A protein has these predicted regions:
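Hydrophobic alpha-helical transmembrane segments
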Residues: 29-36
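Hydrophobic alpha-helical transmembrane segments of integral membrane proteins
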Residues: 202-206
Length: 302
């Protein structure tokens, strides 16, 4: 798959994800409407579908940045970081994205946005403190490659959709417990509706993390290898990115602001994958194993 095919595939997948999100929510609304004999649920699902899709497309980056507690910085607050990003953007032929800093000791970074003209890069304070210039340049080049490859819209939409599924499951659980209990004492029909909503809440609670993993894996971890390779083409220095991967993967700090919905966005997994067995780690990690990324980079000759 060449770069242009990859970009086209990302755009198609982004729209497909929006459509699937809408269809599933409308199907859920229809089931509830039939169970309650009231089409208000279908209209609620329609509105929720439209709002979540619109938010994901237009403001998904802001949702992700807000949930990560990222703070926008200007040139005076981080002059060296700005110069580094601008120089790499000139090399890549990209507009300079907005730059954010996350006040976390764990070294990591991510890119988000709708397209290269509406992009943002967030780095942790730990990344700035623990990496040298060549290593930091490698990480930023990797994230800018995600911007140039149009990975960011799809990745951002996944975060919003996964978060919406989790929010919906939580809402159903609360509604069925509090609202359902009050109504179930009034008549048998209300009691039946409460049971149905409770079952849906349980199913959503079980499926939400599974759906999160499957959607994230569907993005394909191949994009990380491509961003690594493209990042090296920008810096012309594979060792910088290799050393950054080694240093970040060995760091004991965990990223407290990361969640299952946003884990796939980060440069490296924000969770402690060492606690899992090697087989499960390879099956469910949102990123390729670090040793595989390093091995691929070592084969690149500049």
């Amino acid at each position: 798959m060449n770069l242009y095919t990859h970009i086209s595939a990302n755009k198609r997948s982004s729209w497909l994800l929006i459509i699937i999100n809408g269809v599933l929510l409308l199907a859920l609304g229809w089931v509830l409407s039939q169970a309650a004999n009231d089409y208000i649920w279908f209209y609620i699902a329609l509105i929720y579908s439209l709002v979540s899709s619109l938010v994901g497309y237009l403001w998904g980056d802001k949702v992700v940045l807000m949930s990560s507690k990222a703070k926008l910085v200007d040139r005076t607050a981080a002059p060296e970081l700005y110069r580094l990003v601008e120089n790499l953007c000139i090399t890549a032929g990209l507009p300079t994205p907005k730059i954010y800093i996350i006040n976390e000791a764990a070294p990591n970074a991510f890119a988000t946005g709708r397209d290269p003209k509406h992009a943002a890069i967030a780095v942790t304070s730990g990344l700035l403190a623990k990496l040298d210039k060549a290593e930091l340049e490698g990480v930023i080049a990797h994230e800018l490659s995600h911007v140039g490859n149009h990975d960011i819209l799809l990745a951002t939409l996944v975060s919003v959709v996964v978060g919406a599924v989790a929010l919906l499951g939580n809402w159903f659980a609360r509604w069925s417990f509090w609202g359902g209990n009050r109504r179930s004492s009034n008549n048998d029909e209300a009691g039946q509706i409460s049971v149905i909503l409770s079952i849906i809440a349980i199913v959503l609670a079980i499926l939400a993390p599974i759906v999160a993993q499957l959607i994230q894996l569907a993005i394909s971890r191949r994009r990380e290898f491509l961003a690594d390779a493209d990042g090296v083409l920008l810096t012309r220095y594979p060792e910088g990115l290799i050393n950054a991967l080694k240093k970040i993967s060995a760091d004991p700090q965990l990223l407290s602001v990361a969640s299952e919905a946003t884990a796939h966005l980060y440069f490296a997994s924000p969770f402690d994958n060492k606690k899992r067995t090697p087989l499960l780690a390879k099956m469910f990690m949102t990123h390729p194993p670090v040793e595989e990324r390093i091995a691929a980079l070592e084969k690149i000759s500049i």
